[in-house]
Amino acid sequence: MELRDWLRVDVKAGKPLFDQLRTQVIDGVRAGALPPGTRLPTVRDLAGQLGVAANTVARAYRELESAAIVETRGRFGTFISRFDPTDAAMAAAAKEYVGVARALGLTKSDAMRYLTHVPDD
């Protein structure tokens, strides 16, 4: 199965397209659909397949790379990293949480307070 077969973007979702792509790749890694070493389509190829701008896919790939979920090997392409997907997913979630906390002007201790009060399911 190819990435384009299950990767979808919804312009009406109220969530940025690059973030939809990023989240779906993370979900694919966590579910085992994208095992370590899987080569992802080029930015242009995936953008063309999904009907989105190349910059949208490029931003999703950059964010995935900064969270160590994918690694770019120069002209050889972009691949799913060999790191533990749980670690990579949690790093991405933490980065997003920190970004929101900073945007709200919270201190580190205030942000941590919110985490300690999350109810158990």
UniProtKB/Swiss-Prot annotation:
**Compartments where found:** Cytoplasm; Secreted, Cell wall
* Residue ranges of the annotated DNA-binding region, renumbered to this chain: 43-62
Q: Name one GO cellular component term.
A: cytoplasm
Residue span, HTH gntR-type domain: 15-83
Pfam families referenced in this protein's UniProt entry, alphabetically? GntR
For the keyword Nucleotide-binding, the answer is no
Which keywords describe this protein according to UniProt? Answer: Cell wall, Cytoplasm, DNA-binding, Secreted, Transcription, Transcription regulation
| UniProt main location, coarse | cytoplasm
MF GO annotations? DNA binding; DNA-binding transcription factor activity
Source organism, top-level taxon: Bacteria
Explain the purpose of this protein.
Transcriptional regulator that modulates resistance to vancomycin and aminoglycosides. Negatively regulates the expression of several genes responsive to vancomycin, resulting in decreased susceptibility of bacteria to vancomycin. Negatively regulates the expression of genes encoding the ribosome binding protein Hsp, the small subunit of sulfate adenylyltransferase CysD, the L-lysine-epsilon aminotransferase LAT and the protease HtpX. Also modulates purine metabolism and aminoglycoside antibiotic resistance.
Miscellaneous note, as given in the UniProt record, is: Overexpression of Rv1152 in M.smegmatis modifies its response to surface and acid stress. Overexpression also confers M.smegmatis reduced susceptibility to vancomycin.
What protein name does the entry list?
HTH-type transcriptional regulator Rv1152
Its source organism is Mycobacterium tuberculosis (strain ATCC 25618 / H37Rv)
